[in-house]
Structure formats: C-alpha cells, structure tokens
C-alpha cells in the first residue's frame, strides 16, 4: 500500500475526491505529481501557463475537514518599500471577487490565490475541478498583472485603486 492509499484508508470518500482531482488534471493535459503531507492530507501539484504567468496549481484534500483547497502562488513578491501598501491593494482586489480570494504575506511579500470547496454533502466531479482551475487562472490573469505592476512601482496605489474601481 503506497502513502496515498494509507492516507485515505479510513476515508474512501476523500480517496474518490483525490482521484477525481488527479483525473481532471490529467484530462486537462497537465503534468502532475502527488504527495502525502504530514497531517494526513494529500496534494496534487500541476504546472500551467496562463495568459500572463507560469503557475503551479496545488490541490489539497483535507479529509479531516472534508475540504479541497486550491492554492496558486503568484510568481512575484512585493518589495519591502511597497509591502504595507500591497496589503491594501490585495484587499481592494478581494472586494471584486465572487469566488476565491487573494492572500498576502506581509512578512515576505508573497501573494497567493486560494479557492476552497467542501465535499461533505456534495459530489465533486471533474467538471467542478476544471472550473476551479479556469477560475483561478482567470482571476490571476485579470488581477495578477495589475498587482505585479503595482508591486514593480509602475503604478501608484491611487492609480491601482482607480483602475480596480473602474475596470473591476
């Protein structure tokens, strides 16, 4: 029995959800690899190229709380002089999102996109996993380029906020 089978030996529903994630990534033509984490959760990693960025999709099934998370790190960070204001920029973007959110680590300036889906009373299918991938890359393309321009100092916070307000 491999480590993935061991991780889900007490929760066949979690195993089914993880298999669905892996199948969806395979059907999207994405190269993936899987890991078992120390907390008993399992993770599938897949690289993807969006319109603007090279990204790594990280799906994690946390069987302890019946939850799938998708986390995607943006391939840039906010430099130290802009870190406090980058928090305001990320908050402004989050107000525009209807699903998922951007997270920001002020300590190192990293920005992530996160989506979560509970599977306690739900049937998770490949279409739902593909939709999570598409939504994540769409929101990252739409707002990630704006966040990168802000972090690089191309636009001021005021210009960034006006652009977000005007164009969404």
Name every feature range the model reports, one short phrase each.
Residues 47-83:
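Long, continuous compositionally biased terminal/linker segments
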Residues 98-101, 143-155:
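Long, hydrophobic, amphipathic alpha-helical segments used as structural scaffolds
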Residues 83, 89, 117, 123, ...:
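Long, contiguous binding/interaction regions
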Residues 1-56:
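Charge-rich, low-complexity N-terminal segments
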Residues 35-37, 60-62, 105:
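Short beta-strand micro-motifs enriched in acidic
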Residues 148-168:
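Short, highly charged C-terminal tails/helix-capping segments
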Residues 73-110:
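Short, internal acidic amphipathic alpha-helical interface segments
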């Amino acid at each position: 029995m491999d480590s993935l089978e061991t991780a889900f030996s007490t929760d066949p529903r979690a195993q089914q959800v993880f298999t669905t994630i892996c199948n969806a990534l395979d059907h999207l033509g994405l190269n993936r690899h899987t890991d078992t984490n120390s907390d008993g959760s399992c993770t599938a990693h897949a690289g993807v190229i969006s319109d603007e960025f090279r990204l790594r999709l990280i799906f994690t099934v946390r069987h302890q709380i019946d939850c799938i998370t998708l986390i995607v790190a943006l391939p840039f960070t906010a430099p130290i002089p802009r870190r406090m204001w980058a928090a305001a920029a990320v908050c402004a973007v989050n107000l525009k999102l209807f699903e998922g959110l951007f997270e920001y680590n002020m300590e190192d300036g990293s920005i992530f996109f996160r989506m979560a889906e509970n599977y306690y009373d739900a049937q998770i299918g490949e279409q739902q996993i593909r939709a999570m991938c598409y939504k994540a890359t769409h929101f990252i393309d739409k707002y990630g380029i704006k966040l990168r321009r802000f972090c690089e100092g191309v636009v001021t916070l005021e210009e960034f906020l006006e652009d977000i307000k005007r164009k969404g």
